[in-house]
Amino acid sequence: MTDTQVTWLTQEAFDRLKAELDQLIANRPVIAAEINDRREEGDLRENGGYHAAREEQGQQEARIRQLQELLNNAKVGEAPKQSGVALPGSVVKVYYDDDENDTETFLIATRQEGISDGKLEVYSPNSPLGGALLDAKVGESRTYTVPSGNVVKVTLVSAEPYQG
């Protein structure tokens, strides 16, 4: 995330990401010790273990920075309790351009919410589609602009709290 934006997270997702961050930070001395051990093995130009440990450290530090930025800019809330309104944490069903046969069901949330089963697509509330649907009521139509510049009409068929 290069630009600062608020990310909606449930308390559960926030806690899970915070635990991951804490574990990565606690692991820093282990990686540093591994690098030191590998450095003592001799010539660094031909030391695969040293380079692998440095690569692992770089990946770990990048993930730490990503999690810190995400958590610092997170808005923590609970999944919506009500049905019928498209909110972050809602599973919505929509149809496009007045074609009731062209439906799609997805979750309005962030990928950090941890949907790992792959059965449910996730659209961010900050995306053009997610943003257009926010606070829409069942039966309401909205429009949004896709990256190609076309304007698409979307109608909310249903909105239910995610039961993940």
From Swiss-Prot:
Any single biological process term in GO: DNA-templated transcription elongation
PROSITE patterns: GREAB_1, GREAB_2
Annotated coiled-coil segments of the chain: 50-76
A UniProt-annotated Pfam family: GreA_GreB
GO MF assignments: DNA binding; RNA polymerase binding
NCBIfam families the UniProt entry points to: greA (TIGR01462), PRK00226.1-3 (NF001262)
Keywords in alphabetical order: Coiled coil, DNA-binding, Transcription, Transcription regulation
Its biological purpose: Necessary for efficient RNA polymerase transcription elongation past template-encoded arresting sites. The arresting sites in DNA have the property of trapping a certain fraction of elongating RNA polymerases that pass through, resulting in locked ternary complexes. Cleavage of the nascent transcript by cleavage factors such as GreA or GreB allows the resumption of elongation from the new 3'terminus. GreA releases sequences of 2 to 3 nucleotides.
Species annotation: Mycolicibacterium smegmatis (strain ATCC 700084 / mc(2)155) (Mycobacterium smegmatis)
Protein name: Transcription elongation factor GreA
Record InterPro entries: GreA/GreB_C_sf, TF_GreA/GreB_CS, Tscrpt_elong_fac_GreA, Tscrpt_elong_fac_GreA/B, Tscrpt_elong_fac_GreA/B_C, Tscrpt_elong_fac_GreA/B_fam, Tscrpt_elong_fac_GreA/B_N, Tscrpt_elong_fac_GreA/B_N_sf
Similarity-based family: Belongs to the GreA/GreB family.
